[in-house]
UniProtKB/Swiss-Prot annotation:
Region of interest (Disordered), ranges: 31-155
Membrane topology of the entry: Single-pass membrane protein
Protein name: DDRGK domain-containing protein 1
Cytoplasmic side: 24-298
Native source organism of the sequence: Arabidopsis thaliana
Bias kind Basic and acidic residues: ranges: 101-155
Top-rank taxon: Eukaryota
Role according to the record: Substrate adapter for ufmylation, the covalent attachment of the ubiquitin-like modifier UFM1 to substrate proteins.
Length: 298
């Protein structure tokens, strides 16, 4: 783009200088013709009479010719100076315009570079913030995982201690059909198991209050008793323990085998047919009341 602009300016200068060059040549030619024109010869009869005057006239003529020559030279030099001044002014304007465009391009380049650096800096900042957040999230997840592992280890340790405590209170033979009991601990253990079996569905808080234990202690004891086969059941999300006998479990297993694939919702709707959730104490009271009514009627 700069080369094209310089070429156009050069062509304009050449077109402007050519007419001036021809005009100057014509002026110089005229001046040379005027200088080269011979002086007019006076008649002979006037030579003797006006010899002194002729000499006097020649002097002004010569001086006039020299003055005209100097004027022509001055005019020519003045024209050349004007041409040179005009050409220099055009070149100066072209140089200024070129310098201005260069400065504008430099300013635009610096602005683009500053914008690019700012964008890169902002992207680096976002990347650093994202990396820090990822590290914080990973650290938090690792912390929660370690806390969960520690909690599980603590619960397992407490359950193991509770199991050892209960295991020390009774022993089971190889077949698991007989128990050796020592003192009142066996009575307490039997009461705990029978209470759960009779209630069928017992809140853990009520169970803890009944035996003067903490809720976590009740959970640990139930887990220990399940591990040795004394209890079988499930804990729901409402804090209740539901006792399920082996007969009821076998009935559910047989139903699943007969039906094949069974959904959980369907099995839950049919579970009431196999699992009795009514307390046995209430059944016993109902049977006793019915027996008393029959006796009174008879």
């Amino acid at each position: 783009m700069e080369e094209i602009f310089a070429l156009i300016v050069s062509m304009i200068l050449i077109v402007a200088v050519i007419p001036l060059f021809f005009w100057k040549r014509r002026r110089d030619a005229r001046s040379r013709e005027e200088v080269a024109e011979p002086p007019q010869v006076q008649p002979r009869e006037n030579v003797a009479r006006a010899g002194g005057g002729r000499r006097m006239r020649r002097r002004p003529a010569a001086s006039g010719a020299s003055s005209s020559t100097s004027n022509v030279q001055e005019n020519g030099s003045g024209s050349e100076d004007e041409d040179e001044d005009e050409a220099g002014g055009t070149q100066a304007r072209a140089s200024k315009k070129k310098e201005k465009k260069r400065q504008e391009r430099e300013a635009q380049r610096q602005a683009e570079e500053a914008t690019r650096e700012s964008r890169n800096t902002k992207q680096d900042w976002y990347a650093e913030m994202r990396r820090k957040k990822d590290e914080e999230r990973e650290a938090e997840e690792l912390k929660l995982e370690e806390e969960e592992k520690a909690r599980q280890a603590k619960e397992e340790e407490a359950a193991a201690l509770e199991f050892d405590k209960w295991k020390g209170e009774f022993s089971v033979d190889a077949e698991g059909t007989t128990e050796e009991v020592q003192g009142g601990n066996q009575d307490l253990l039997s009461e705990f198991v029978e209470y759960i079996k009779k209630q069928k569905c017992v809140p853990l808080e009520d169970l803890a209050a009944e035996f003067h234990l903490r809720t976590q202690e009740c959970i640990n004891r139930i887990a220990s008793l399940e591990s040795i086969g004394r209890l079988s059941g499930v804990m729901d999300d409402r804090g209740k323990y539901i006792y399920i006998s082996m007969e009821e479990m076998n009935a559910v297993a047989d139903y699943i085998k007969r039906q094949g694939r069974v959904s959980i919702s369907h099995l839950a709707s049919k579970s009431n047919q196999f699992i009795d959730l009514e307390p046995k104490v209430q059944h016993q009271l109902t049977e006793e009341i019915s027996g008393m009514e029959e006796i009174s009627v008879s």
